[in-house]
């Protein structure tokens, strides 16, 4: 298993390190490192600290902060930036942009699992300017061009 460097910025997190919920989980659960409950009203976005910093280091990898499906489906709590991209050379605190897109206020409790962190391989590319593309079967068709079934 690949290792990931983590720095504990808030001592309360020492016993609350991100973990996988099940053996098959892809994401490590991130918690809200807050002193007291926060009420997030509909339409509001709040930046929530995790009390942790990571250093991926290897430029062949990046980390992604993703929403937890249950919070989004049941309560309308998603990420304000939809996906948080953590570059391999970033070393600051992980923050979760938390948006209540639902219709009811949501009470976020201290140390509540809020988002998940997924580490994935990344391929950097070199851009090659061309005048025309080699023709493909799809061409420039997009936004529903392949149908629904």
UniProtKB/Swiss-Prot annotation:
Instruction: List the GO biological process terms.
Output: dUMP biosynthetic process; dUTP catabolic process
Q: Which reaction does it catalyse?
A: dUTP + H2O = dUMP + diphosphate + H(+)
Which pathway does the protein contribute to?
Answer: Pyrimidine metabolism; dUMP biosynthesis; dUMP from dCTP (dUTP route): step 2/2
Q: Please name the GO terms that the record assigns under molecular function.
A: dUTP diphosphatase activity; magnesium ion binding
Entry's CDD domains? trimeric_dUTPase
Q: Which UniProt keywords are listed?
A: Hydrolase, Magnesium, Metal-binding, Nucleotide metabolism
Does the UniProt entry include the keyword Metal-binding?
yes
Q: What is its EC number?
A: 3.6.1.23
**Source taxon at top rank:** Bacteria
What is the required cofactor set for this protein?
A: Mg(2+)
Does the keyword Metal-binding feature in the UniProt annotation?
yes
Tell me which family the UniProt entry assigns to this protein: Belongs to the dUTPase family.
Q: What does this protein do?
A: This enzyme is involved in nucleotide metabolism: it produces dUMP, the immediate precursor of thymidine nucleotides and it decreases the intracellular concentration of dUTP so that uracil cannot be incorporated into DNA.
Which NCBIfam families does this chain map to? Answer: dut (TIGR00576), PRK00601.1 (NF001862)
What is this protein identified as?
Answer: Deoxyuridine 5'-triphosphate nucleotidohydrolase
Which species expresses this protein natively?
Polynucleobacter asymbioticus (strain DSM 18221 / CIP 109841 / QLW-P1DMWA-1)
Q: What is the lineage of its organism?
A: Bacteria, Pseudomonadati, Pseudomonadota, Betaproteobacteria, Burkholderiales
């Amino acid at each position: 298993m690949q290792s990931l460097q983590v720095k504990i910025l808030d001592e309360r997190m020492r016993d609350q390190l991100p973990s996988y919920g099940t053996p098959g989980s892809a994401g490590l659960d991130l918690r809200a490192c807050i002193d007291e409950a926060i009420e997030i009203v509909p339409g509001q976005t709040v930046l929530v600290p995790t009390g942790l910093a990571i250093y991926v280091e290897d430029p062949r990898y990046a980390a992604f902060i993703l929403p937890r499906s249950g919070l989004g489906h049941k309560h309308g709590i998603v990420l304000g930036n939809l996906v948080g991209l953590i570059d391999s050379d970033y070393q600051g605190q992980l923050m979760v942009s938390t948006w209540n897109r639902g219709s009811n206020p949501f009470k976020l409790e201290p140390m509540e699992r809020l988002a998940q962190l997924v580490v994935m391989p990344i391929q950097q590319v070199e851009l090659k300017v061309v005048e025309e593309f080699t023709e493909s079967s799809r061409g420039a068709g997009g936004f529903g061009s392949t149908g629904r079934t």
